[in-house]
């Protein structure tokens, strides 16, 4: 699991312990995946990702010093690409300054899936007077097909059981990619929209 370059830049001013929490879970995943997977259940990934979600959401609930450019900058980036069906984005409009750089492939995958609720949330986000109200975070991770399936199931159950959390989750289709010669691992994008 790793942060996109624009996310890393945007999170530079956040407390180290938040990044430390995510990094610890990432290291556990990498260890299981690369070094000693046979000693762990195949479905552990889903639970760990749910815990990342939970910890991050709790952190965002309590923070009051988010950089001003983070939420509004990302929202502006997504809005400028015009999330409309059957339209190719104009990548020349994507902002690449102020710590809001966004990968072209990432923008394209959002548009290709045309999630209407995301468009609506982005539009609302741009109209907010208080930048702390919402926060968009992108996390990319490598997982297997079975782990992906279990992640979706466990996250759904996690959301149902925690009625008080205000997290919306967008998970879209798998992008096939070989990593270190392992053909059955795929890159999956997760977009977490935190609503405080």
Swiss-Prot record:
Keyword annotations: Plasmid
Protein name per Swiss-Prot or TrEMBL: Uncharacterized protein aq_aa32
Source domain of life: Bacteria
